[in-house]
């Protein structure tokens, strides 16, 4: 192993910008679909040399349209896809007609579903004194479009805002129970996702975000904080116009600050003393298309931009590393993330 995993205390110092000798690593071994199939034991052997500074545990979420366990009601909505899904993900929504909204709310999954934390509890023996992060995908925006469909959601912002607010409160109640479960098990943070941006800006106007999402975010973050935990948010795309709102809501760590979408120098200089960054190394171009030297230089560039002695920087991959990525580039990334030090 290149170095020992960082302690829980060191990670907390980095998140809270109170110093720390090393930059914590998380999601640096974010393997996309097909990567392990391609490289197999070679990738496993390589990855074993690089520590996970964060222990992450994922509860069993409700299924989309089909239950994720033996309880047929443990899913967000029912659709008969027994013959396969033959259309885009944006059309696999659970709530097609708002006339069914009351029924949908009555049939909401139970956050206290028996067994949904069994795997989390069993995995705790592997935490080894590290920072413990409770995880699930999809918070508000992502859950809204999964329930309504992306096109419907864009219309709902203007025609059905009242219903979205009711749905948001219902989701908030659900998430609070999940947060409670993680808190009872001694977790240090909550990681979740809302891809709020596309390549050139947010998926909704800042005004829509302020009216609909900001109150939900504030209450969610406040609740997590009340349990003594941090909030980590994964949000792809260009979130520049929403940064002030995310900071106002109290988000502690933002991932990935997507390369090509956000101006890293501006983000680091403007917001680096207000929020911490889990910067994600570019998986769209640098890792799959660059040379080993390109990968190393990119990591040097990122650290030199974001590093501060007081902390506030964590490092990983921007998203799932895909199988078109050369193994030598993955090795170079892991080496530099673990060994490179700020030099300016």
Where does each model-flagged region fall?
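Catalytic cores of TIM-barrel enzymes
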Residues: 1-344
């Amino acid at each position: 192993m290149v170095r020992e995993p960082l302690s829980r205390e060191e990670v907390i110092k980095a998140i809270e910008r109170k110093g720390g000798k090393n930059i914590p690593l998380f999601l640096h071994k974010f393997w996309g679909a097909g990567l392990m199939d391609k490289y197999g034991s070679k990738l496993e052997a390589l990855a074993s040399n690089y520590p996970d500074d964060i222990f992450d545990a994922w509860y069993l979420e409700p299924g989309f349209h089909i239950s994720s366990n033996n309880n047929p009601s443990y899913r967000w909505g029912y659709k008969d896809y027994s013959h396969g899904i033959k259309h885009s993900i944006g059309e696999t929504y659970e709530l097609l007609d708002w006339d069914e909204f009351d029924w949908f709310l009555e049939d909401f999954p139970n956050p206290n579903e028996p067994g949904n934390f069994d795997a989390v509890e069993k995995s705790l023996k592997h935490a080894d004194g590290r920072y413990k992060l409770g995880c699930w995908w999809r918070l508000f925006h992502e859950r809204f479009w999964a329930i309504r469909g992306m096109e419907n959601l864009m219309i709902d912002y203007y025609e059905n805002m009242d219903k979205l607010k009711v749905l948001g409160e219902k989701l908030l109640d659900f998430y609070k129970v999940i947060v409670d479960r993680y808190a009872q098990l001694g977790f240090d943070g909550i990681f979740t996702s809302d891809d709020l941006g596309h390549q050139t800006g947010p998926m909704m106007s800042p005004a829509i975000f302020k009216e609909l999402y900001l109150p939900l975010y504030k209450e969610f973050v406040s609740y997590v904080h009340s349990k003594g935990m941090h909030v980590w948010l994964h949000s792809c795309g260009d979130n520049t116009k929403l940064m002030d709102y995310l900071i106002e809501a109290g988000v502690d760590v933002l991932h990935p600050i997507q390369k090509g979408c956000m101006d890293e120098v501006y983000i680091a200089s403007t917001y680096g003393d207000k929020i911490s960054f889990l910067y994600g190394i570019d998986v769209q171009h640098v890792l799959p298309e660059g040379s080993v030297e390109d990968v190393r230089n990119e990591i040097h560039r990122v650290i030199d931009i974001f590093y501060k002695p007081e902390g506030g920087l964590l490092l990983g991959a921007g998203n799932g590393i895909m199988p078109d990525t050369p193994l030598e580039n993955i090795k170079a990334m892991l080496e530099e993330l673990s060994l490179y030090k700020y030099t300016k």
